[in-house]
């Protein structure tokens, strides 16, 4: 019988039960016991769901209260000194302080840095290490969760982040080489593997996703050393797991490592199958990632079955396992909950539960079970209906794309001339202050939106409520003394969803939530067809907000690359083509904002770096169309209109030329967690336009001291001309409360005023 396995399951629950439990605990409404009870219930539910879907070997230790990389650091006692006292007194509180920061009871701790998990929309906490780092087992989470499943009658495969990837995903605070710590880390892994074996685990999934990256000789040697060491002690069988791309030139290395099985991504790396089969050692299990763990489209089962049958004929009997390409963490839980979705589009989709069923169908087909044919036929019919659907293809969009020229992507004049025209129009002080866009989405705002959507609040009453919130936001900013204002975005549920709801070619689920980080969940739009803007999307609210103040009001848009990256994107055409379609829709919106008197327009591109292919050799093509798309959206304005953009979590050294090529008049970037380290790229490159380095971390409720912000601004001023500098938070303020927001922004304005006075 063909084995069906899974690499990971969504943690949050089909109805975001984990999010609610976490936030209740953080508010002090529930204690740790109640939180852990919810966590146990979710794990049990998910294991049973996988078993019932036909998964023979589901994972354990894929669950996390916040983040699996943080879990790994915590498990191995890689806890920075500043958290030791709290962790020793209350481990769970210390764990959450590492994730979120903590400012209470005379404790003032900032959080670990957060960044994107490879090129996905999930975020992980970056472990902080140093040259004298000590590792030791703290707790027994992987063993406890394996035994928890066993008590339910379900045998699982514990998941561990592998030692080399753990180090490569970490940062050292003293400039030392992360891989030099491998010697100290391996004994702890060896100890853990021995304990898992003693607990009865037959297999352990050891994730080494960095195997799909460009690796230098030192890193390749670290892999050899690590797995030679792990192979010496007693251990369960190891499934060496790669995902997010082909192994490429690391294939030989991966097959040399002494593991008992190898998982490969055959969605993003279909071309690697032959090379793997030609060199797979006898007796080694091949886990074939045939179902896309990152997107929500039904699998072309006939194509997947062809690959599976080909592999089946080349590996030892019972040594072919079927799996998703990666963990299902990145997709919603269950399509069956979507009762009101367009029936045609719904028939083209598969969420986590459905993807597991697809794997069971493939396994049954391989085993020649007749019941598989019905499901295969249904899939063929659904895919053909999608290919032929007029909902997907629009001739007017194709005509507009064909009419694009180089002039479509150019501003009228160069930045030096534009900046003079803008300063003449805007008359801003030195170190101008602004925010990134959103203001706190309070419970009242969320409840009003929910009541409006459910029909309990009339459109006129909802509009009156939003106008009052917008005016309060504008008045608050004026009182604080900000220079360029925003309207607060109270009418928006999400920075992508809000636009997607107003664009043809997008569709939305009701419960299609995926985890972004911690309790933060997003409901990505689904781009199923050609994109068109039927009507203006933001002009009414931006113009209303501008009518309330004499200060400049920013129009706020989400950029084409970010809308693409943060959506589930159609897989029947190149991503670049879909991105250009979105850019043309935004181009029309930018033009309408300018006509309405909006003189500052921000086109957020926080996701531009995460779209980079994992292999450097593929970067140029992506950056070309990403920059082109931004410029399509932003270039049809007068010199006096100031174009801003914003980027998150980015390391800029290797893409700084592309960032400059966007030709935004002002770029704001997230720098506070990295203590302004990210500015180095702009300094070395001599970035010509204006920059707003974030001076405080909005992902934490902590209110920083004025002196901290002044110090960060002085660090920025030491390396960049003062006339280039703007002052702003790291990111939008949607998830923060009003009290801390007002206090932090007032402190930020005071910091800017101090620099102006010097």
Swiss-Prot record:
Protein name as it appears in the record: 5-methyltetrahydropteroyltriglutamate--homocysteine methyltransferase
Gene that produces this protein: metE
Pathway as given in its UniProt record: Amino-acid biosynthesis; L-methionine biosynthesis via de novo pathway; L-methionine from L-homocysteine (MetE route): step 1/1
Function: Catalyzes the transfer of a methyl group from 5-methyltetrahydrofolate to homocysteine resulting in methionine formation.
Cofactor dependency: Zn(2+)
Organism listed in the record: Xylella fastidiosa (strain M12)
Binding residues annotated for L-methionine, in chain numbering: 436-438, 489, 604
Positions contributing to Zn(2+) binding: 646, 648, 670, 731
Reaction(s) the record says it catalyses: 5-methyltetrahydropteroyltri-L-glutamate + L-homocysteine = tetrahydropteroyltri-L-glutamate + L-methionine
E.C. number(s) listed in UniProt: 2.1.1.14
Residues annotated as binding 5-methyltetrahydropteroyltri-L-glutamate: 16-19, 116, 520-521, 566, 610
């Amino acid at each position: 019988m063909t084995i069906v396995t899974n690499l990971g399951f969504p943690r949050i629950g089909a109805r975001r039960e984990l999010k609610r439990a976490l936030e209740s605990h953080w508010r002090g409404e529930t204690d740790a016991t109640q939180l852990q009870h919810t966590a146990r219930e979710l794990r049990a539910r998910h294991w049973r769901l996988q078993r019932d879907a036909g998964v023979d070997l589901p994972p354990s230790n894929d669950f996390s209260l916040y983040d699996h990389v943080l879990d790994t650091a915590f498990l191995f006692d890689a806890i920075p000194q500043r958290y030791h006292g709290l962790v020793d007194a209350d481990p769970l509180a210390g764990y959450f302080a590492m994730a979120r920061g903590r400012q209470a009871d005379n404790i003032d701790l900032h959080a670990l840095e957060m960044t994107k998990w490879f090129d996905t929309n999930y975020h992980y906490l970056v472990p902080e290490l140093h040259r004298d780092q000590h590792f030791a087992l703290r707790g027994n989470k992987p063993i406890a969760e394996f035994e928890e499943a066993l008590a339910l009658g379900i045998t699982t495969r514990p998941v561990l982040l592998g030692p080399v990837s753990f180090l490569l995903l970490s940062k050292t605070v003293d400039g030392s080489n992360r891989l030099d710590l491998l010697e100290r880390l391996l004994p702890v892994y060896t100890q853990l593997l021995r304990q898992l074996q003693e607990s009865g685990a037959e297999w352990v999934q050891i994730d080494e996703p960095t195997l799909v990256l460009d690796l230098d000789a030192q890193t390749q040697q670290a892999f050899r050393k690590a797995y030679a060491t792990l192979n010496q002690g007693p251990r369960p069988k190891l499934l060496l797991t790669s995902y997010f791309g082909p192994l490429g030139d690391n294939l030989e290395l991966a097959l040399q490592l002494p593991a008992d099985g190898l998982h490969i991504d055959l969605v993003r790396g279909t071309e690697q199958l032959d090379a793997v089969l030609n060199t797979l050692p006898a007796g080694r299990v091949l886990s074939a990632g045939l179902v896309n763990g990152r997107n929500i489209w039904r699998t072309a089962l006939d194509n997947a079955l062809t690959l599976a049958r080909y592999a089946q004929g080349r590996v030892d009997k019972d040594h072919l396992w079927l799996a998703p390409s990666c963990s299902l963490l990145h997709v919603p839980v269950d399509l069956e909950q979507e009762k009101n979705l367009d029936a045609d589009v719904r028939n083209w989709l598969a969420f986590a539960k459905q993807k597991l069923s697809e794997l069971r169908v493939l396994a049954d087909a391989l085993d020649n079970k007749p019941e598989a044919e019905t499901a295969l036929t249904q899939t063929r019919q659904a895919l053909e209906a999608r290919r032929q659907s007029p909902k997907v293809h629009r001739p007017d969009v194709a005509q507009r794309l064909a009419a694009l020229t180089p002039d479509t992507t150019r501003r009228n004049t160069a930045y030096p001339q534009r900046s003079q025209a803008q300063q003449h129009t805007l008359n801003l002080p030195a170190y101008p202050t602004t925010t990134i866009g959103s203001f706190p989405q309070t419970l009242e705002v969320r409840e009003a939106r929910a009541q409006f959507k459910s029909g309990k609040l009339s459109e006129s009453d909802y509009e009156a409520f939003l106008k009052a919130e917008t005016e309060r936001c504008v008045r608050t900013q004026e009182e604080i003394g900000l220079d360029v204002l925003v309207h607060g975005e109270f009418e928006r549920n999400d920075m992508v969803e809000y636009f997607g709801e107003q664009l043809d070619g997008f569709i939305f689920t009701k419960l299609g939530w995926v985890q972004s980080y911690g309790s933060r969940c997003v409901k990505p739009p689904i781009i199923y067809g050609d994109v068109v803007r039927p009507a203006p999307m933001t002009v009414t609210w931006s113009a209303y907000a501008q009518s309330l103040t004499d200060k400049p009001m920013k129009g706020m848009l989400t950029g084409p690359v970010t809308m693409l990256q943060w959506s589930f994107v159609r897989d029947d055409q190149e991503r670049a083509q879909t991105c250009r379609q979105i850019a043309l829709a935004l181009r029309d919106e930018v033009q309408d904002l300018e006509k309405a008197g909006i003189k500052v327009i921000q086109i957020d591109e926080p996701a531009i770096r995460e779209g980079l292919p994992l292999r450097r050799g593929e970067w140029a093509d992506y950056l070309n169309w990403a920059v082109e798309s931004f410029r399509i959206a932003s270039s049809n304005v007068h010199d006096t209109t100031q174009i801003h953009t914003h980027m998150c979590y980015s390391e800029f050294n290797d893409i700084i030329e592309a960032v400059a090529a966007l030709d935004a008049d002002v770029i704001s970037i997230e720098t506070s967690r990295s203590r302004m380290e990210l500015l180095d790229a702009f300094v070395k490159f001599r970035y010509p336009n204006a920059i707003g380095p974030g001076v405080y971390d909005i992902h934490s409720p902590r209110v920083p001291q004025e002196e901290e912000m002044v110090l960060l601004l002085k660090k920025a001023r030491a390396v960049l001309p003062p006339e280039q500098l703007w002052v702003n938070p790291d990111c939008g303020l949607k998830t923060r409360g009003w009290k801390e927001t007002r206090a932090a922004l007032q402190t930020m304005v005071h910091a800017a005023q101090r620099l102006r006075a010097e």
